């Protein structure tokens, strides 16, 4: 240092020694360091030894004059001199060639420099306070470096007693803790025995605070390595003003407060649904784009939202966490358990506004509402058939037996399957259908959970929606073939219907009434097809007892007659009259299309007429006697002339089934006169069901195609049959029973 060299030159001259306070104190500091090194028996620092040797003469000259007065000051600051030497040692550990890390030399600190603990002599120089404050500052930096070194400890290449390990218990904690990586490199170790004399005894006690051992640095890393000012900031300083909940970030508090205020600033531009968070809106938009970016790693199934995927992953767990307290069933999802618990009660909160039917789940109500959307009619198209009801003299029991639109047990689809078959379904077939319904329900129920309500209608197409898509893509050519096949299928079922009529006499129907979703005493959960047959009582009237409106009069014609008698002279000629079917049009000449209106009190008498024991009347072709009126057109009849029952049954929601096409000779009345007379009244449940929605062109007087029209109008050789359509699809089941739920 310049001060040291100047002091040595002045003292080496041998002249009068000028007492200088600062050089003398530095000389005393260096002398004390040399004495401590000699007491331990090791060598001092090379720089310190050089400086001690260079200033030896000045030390001797200065100590002769005023050595006693300066020994007292040296004893006071011996502790601080030891600390300063320790700081110099730490600075020498890093070495001058590699620049020290910037984090080890940060001047900004969360600690305030502490004034020296010893009392300062009054009137002393201010340099003493500056040196003391600098020593405290360096002490703080040294503690930071020691804490950083303790945090970066790793197992060095040397053993426990190798050269890379510092003296135990002095700098880096216990003896088993290895040194930091930068102390175990090649070359002489800076912590070796000859590198630095660690002060023993009182010097070590002065280096560390009282009460803490030399291994205290490992506990100071968290507090010393924090950024300035972080220790004073609270961990959660953002508090909700509604519920006093604390948050670490202001954005989290903002989102939380929106749950109290119900603020939803992010809305979907497609459906208008609003959300509190922007990421929720982003996940929602995947529903409209039909993208499923979140894939399950187990089964590969895709989901629109990440939280839905998280719920799905529970399905792959070996153990079901949610268990029913009533029947001990377990479920992977809590929403499924909640739905299952409703089966143990009669709570059905969702009610249909059209028919009053109640459901346990909202998704079941939505699916049921689609049946009303198919059969909706305007108020102007409503046909009141109250007079017809009075003519039938219905009893109170029959009026209470309602015909539900979606009741599969009484639906004509059920009777259609029975009339074409030879007997009841076997028990194994019924169990197979039950298991299939349970599997279909599991697939559809997976999308109905509490986490994603908007996804349950717009996700994958359900199994129950497939027949509806069939209707949308129905081709006109397929429809024409289906109509042709329908007529032949009806004619072919005549023999089966007559064979069943003998066996049905004397039997009494059981379990009459509607199949509600889960009424008291019932056995099914919701709209579930049942395998039981409903047979009519022997006392019920047959086809001949049906009231005939005055507009349609049937009378007998001799078998040899060429055709029906002509109409009165004043009657207008019927338009679109088909030669082969002269009895199929009403008096006004327009084809009658039934109104989609449901009567719920005419079910049991009308749908089972084919099973009564009354023989059919003689096969005579009926004709229509028109009643000409010049003032107004004739009124619309209450039921279709080509139906054996009122047309209200046409409003029952039905899916068009493609039936196998017959050969043409079955439809030709010339080849089979018995089938061409009045076979349409022998199975009215089939005929009224299929003819009410879309009457075939053969029955409306319109030729379905060139080949079929020519075959029915002229006598000639039979033409090749149209291509055979695929077999009919099974009846649509839209519900599941409690037995299926318990069996899953």
From Swiss-Prot:
Residues 1-24, 38-77, 391-593, 608-648, 686-744 are annotated as: Disordered. PROSITE patterns: ZINC_FINGER_C2H2_1, ZINC_FINGER_C2H2_2. Residues 53-64 have a biased composition (Gly residues). Disulfide bonds: none annotated. One of its GO terms (biological process) is embryonic pattern specification. Residues 424-441, 508-522 have a biased composition (Basic and acidic residues). Pfam families: zf-C2H2 (PF00096). Residues 391-403, 442-458, 468-482 have a biased composition (Acidic residues). Keywords: Developmental protein, Metal-binding, Nucleus, Pair-rule protein, Phosphoprotein, Repeat, Transcription, Transcription regulation, Zinc, Zinc-finger. Residues 561-576, 719-731 have a biased composition (Pro residues). InterPro entries: C2H2-ZF_Transcription_Reg, Znf_C2H2_sf, Znf_C2H2_type. Changing residue 284 to Y: In bowl2; embryonic lethal. Legs containing clones show fusion and truncation of tarsomeres and disrupted expression of the leg patterning genes bab2, dac and B-H1. It is found in: Nucleus. Expressed at the termini of the blastoderm embryo in three domains; strongly expressed at the posterior pole, relatively weakly expressed at the anterior pole and expressed in a broad transverse stripe just anterior to the presumptive cephalic furrow. Subsequent to the blastoderm stage, the expression pattern reflects the morphological rearrangements associated with gastrulation. Additionally, at early gastrulation, terminal expression is supplemented by weak expression in seven stripes. These primary stripes are rapidly supplemented by seven secondary stripes. Changing residue 279 to N: In bowl4; embryonic lethal with 50% larval/pupal escapers. SUPFAM superfamilies: beta-beta-alpha zinc fingers. It comes from the Eukaryota. GO terms for cellular component: nucleus. The modification Phosphoserine is found at residues 395, 407. A zinc finger (C2H2-type) spans 238-260, 266-288, 294-316, 322-344, 350-372. PANTHER family: ODD-SKIPPED - RELATED, PROTEIN BOWEL. Putative transcription factor. Required for leg joint formation, acting downstream of Notch to pattern the leg tarsal segments. Functions in the terminal pathway during embryogenesis, acting downstream of tll in the posterior of the embryo. Acts in a hierarchy downstream of drm and lin during foregut and hindgut patterning and morphogenesis. Involved in cell rearrangement during elongation of the embryonic hindgut. Regulates expression of hindgut patterning genes to establish the small intestine region of the embryonic hindgut. This is Protein bowel.
């Amino acid at each position: 240092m310049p001060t040291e060299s100047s002091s040595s030159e002045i003292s080496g001259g041998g002249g009068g020694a000028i007492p200088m306070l600062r050089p003398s104190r530095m000389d005393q500091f260096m002398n004390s360091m040399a004495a401590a090194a000699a007491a331990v028996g090791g060598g001092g620092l090379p720089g310190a030894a050089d400086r001690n040797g260079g200033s030896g003469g000045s030390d001797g000259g200065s100590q002769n004059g005023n050595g006693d007065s300066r020994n007292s000051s040296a004893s006071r600051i011996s502790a601080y001199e030891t600390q300063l030497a320790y700081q110099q040692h730490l600075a020498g550990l890093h070495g001058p060639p590699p620049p020290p890390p910037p984090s080890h030399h940060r001047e900004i600190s969360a600690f305030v420099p502490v004034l020296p603990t010893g009392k300062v002599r009054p009137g002393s120089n201010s340099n003493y306070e500056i040196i003391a404050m600098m020593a405290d500052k360096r002490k703080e930096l040294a503690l930071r470096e020691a804490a950083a070194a303790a945090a970066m400890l790793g197992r060095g290449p040397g053993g426990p007693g190798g050269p890379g390990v510092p003296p135990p218990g002095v700098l880096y904690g216990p003896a088993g803790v290895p040194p930091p990586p930068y102390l175990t490199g090649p070359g002489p170790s800076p912590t070796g025995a000859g590198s630095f004399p660690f002060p023993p005894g009182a010097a070590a006690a002065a280096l560390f605070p009282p009460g803490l051992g030399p291994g205290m640095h490992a506990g100071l890393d968290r507090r010393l390595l924090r950024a300035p000012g972080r220790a004073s900031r609270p961990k959660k300083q953002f508090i909700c003003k509604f519920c006093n909940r604390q948050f670490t970030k202001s954005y989290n508090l903002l989102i939380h407060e929106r749950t109290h205020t119900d603020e939803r600033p992010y809305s979907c531009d497609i459906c208008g649904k609003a959300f509190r968070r922007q990421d929720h809106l982003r996940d929602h938009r995947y529903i409209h784009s039909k993208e499923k970016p979140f894939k399950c790693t187990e089964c590969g199934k895709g989901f629109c939202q990440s939280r839905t995927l998280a719920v799905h992953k529970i399905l792959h767990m070996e153990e079901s966490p949610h268990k029913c307290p009533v029947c001990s069933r377990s479920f992977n999802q809590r929403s499924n358990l909640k739905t299952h618990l409703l089966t143990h009660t009669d709570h059905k909160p969702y009610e249909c506004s059209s028919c009053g039917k109640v459901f346990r789940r909202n998704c079941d109500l939505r699916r049921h509402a689609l049946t009303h959307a198919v059969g909706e009619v305007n108020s102007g198209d409503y046909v009141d058939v109250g007079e017809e009801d009075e003519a039938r003299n219905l009893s109170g029991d029959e009026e209470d037996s309602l015909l539900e639109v979606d009741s599969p047990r009484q639906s004509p689809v059920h009777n259609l399957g029975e009339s074409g078959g030879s007997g009841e379904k076997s028990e194994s077939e019924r169990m197979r259908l039950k298991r299939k319904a349970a599997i279909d329900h599991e697939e559809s129920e997976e999308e109905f959970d509490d986490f994603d309500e908007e996804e349950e209608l717009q996700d994958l197409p359900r199994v129950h929606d497939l027949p509806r898509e069939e209707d949308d893509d129905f081709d006109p050519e397929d429809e024409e073939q289906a109509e042709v096949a329908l007529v032949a299928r009806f004619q072919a079922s005549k023999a089966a219907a007559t064979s069943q009529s003998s066996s049905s006499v004397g039997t009494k129907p059981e379990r009459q009434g509607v199949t509600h979703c889960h009424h008291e005493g019932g056995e099914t959960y919701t709209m579930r097809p049942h395998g039981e047959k409903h047979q009519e009582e022997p006392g019920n009237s047959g086809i001949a007892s049906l009231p005939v409106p005055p507009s349609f009069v049937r009378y007998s014609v001799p078998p040899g007659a060429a055709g029906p008698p002509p109409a009165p002279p004043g009657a207008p000629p019927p338009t679109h009259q088909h030669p082969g079917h002269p009895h199929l049009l009403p008096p006004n000449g327009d084809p009658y299309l039934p109104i989609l209106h449901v009567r719920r009190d005419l079910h049991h008498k009308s749908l089972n007429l084919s099973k009564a024991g009354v023989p059919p009347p003689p096969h005579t072709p009926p004709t229509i006697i028109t009643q000409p009126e010049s003032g107004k057109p004739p009124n619309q009849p209450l039921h279709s002339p080509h139906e054996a029952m009122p047309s209200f049954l046409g409003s029952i929601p039905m899916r068009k089934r493609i039936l196998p096409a017959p050969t043409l000779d079955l439809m030709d009345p010339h080849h089979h006169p018995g089938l061409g007379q009045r076979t349409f009244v022998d199975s009215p449940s089939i005929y009224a069901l299929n003819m009410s929605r879309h009457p075939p062109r053969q029955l409306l007087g319109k030729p379905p195609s060139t080949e079929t029209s020519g075959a029915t109008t002229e006598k000639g050789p039979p033409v090749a049959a149209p291509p055979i359509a695929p077999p009919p699809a099974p009846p649509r089941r839209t519900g599941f029973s409690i037995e299926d739920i318990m069996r899953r």
